[in-house]
Amino acid sequence: MRKLVYLVLVLGLTFLNVRCKSETKQNKKEEQNIGKQYSSLENRFQKLVNYPVGANNFPRSMSLAPEVVHKVPSKDWTSGFFPGNLWLIHELTGDSIYKVKAQEWTVLMEDQKENDRTHDMGFKVYCSFGEGLKQDPDNQYYKDVIIESAKTLITRYNDTVKSIRSWDFNKDVWDFPVIIDNMMNLELLFEATKISGDNIYHNIAVQHANTTLKHQFRPDYSVFHVINYDTISGVVKTKDTHQGFDRNSTWARGQAWAIYGYTMSYRYTNNPKYLAQAEATTQFYMEHENLPKDGVPYWDFNDPEISDAPRDASAAAIVTSALFELYTYTNNKTYLDFATQVLNTLNSEAYLLKDTVNGPFILNHSTGNWPKNDEIDEPIVYGDYYFLEALKRKQNLILK
């Protein structure tokens, strides 16, 4: 496909004016740069493909001193990202060995399709089976698992609250918690309707997105992490955080989930309110006085010791991937330039793991759960997923 696009570009030079020639040269230069980027990442990619397959062996994060890979079973909310990483690397490189390994890991996620104790079905199933379906669109097995998973996920929907319940723990604290992360799981529902033709999944996803839009944001478009609803009346009981610094702070990854979630929701609905929300939350993020110059945020924008706070490369990767898509809907070059800058920053020695590190990860310097002192300044699997997706989206823009 890349060769075909390149050939079309070359043949078209005969008919292009000077400006178009300049733009074509720039595209070719960027395409060459992408090739160099993949070459520089090849050693890290090999660490992923050589990692041993196992049902309880999904790599979630990694300590570096000493080197210890933190492994989880398929029930963990992060388990679907590693199969997704392999699918994305296959798409980026065309090397079939990554597809073979992606298939082996993906089938290990099937046991989650009836797990009704989690809201993270999209992360688990769509990042694995969904990525597989993109590359094998006639695979009925993948379609069936996605549909069954969507059926399971909507059992957590409450029609009074008009949202999908997030966690089941802390029932003495929360009646019906909904976290901003949950926006990411709507993609599974939107796709389930496309596959099955049944609008129930799409409609529930829209209801959830509407409720979140109404209650989860402050006037400046920063996001609350957790909204607690009353299941009898549907009204908001409390607005809180679980992974941010405090209830009034802006947790960087939460803001990233919001940017990505409403950009993705616009893709499936063409609802201008979702596009406006994606742009407003992006503006808050990009213009925040505490965002470092390299575009990789501190774990929370309001950490009182901000200059010494750990960064969160995963949040940067999520936003970068989202902005490449948001650019296609708005033609706002500010988004493209910012995303390109941050992608280049992530794809540098400052954030890439050294070749000598043996774990199946790519990026360093992500922060998982600061309040619990868990996964601080470490490689984390979902950071890699959105980094790889951002690389792919950038490639698609260049080859378009």
From Swiss-Prot:
The active site is at residues 120, 181. Keywords: Hydrolase, Signal. It is found in: Cell surface. InterPro entries: 6-hairpin_glycosidase_sf, 6hp_glycosidase-like_sf, UG_Glycosaminoglycan_Hydrolase. It is an enzyme of class 3 (hydrolase). The keyword Chloroplast does not apply. One of its GO terms (cellular component) is cell surface. This is Unsaturated glucuronyl hydrolase. The lineage of its organism: Bacteria, Pseudomonadati, Bacteroidota, Flavobacteriia, Flavobacteriales.
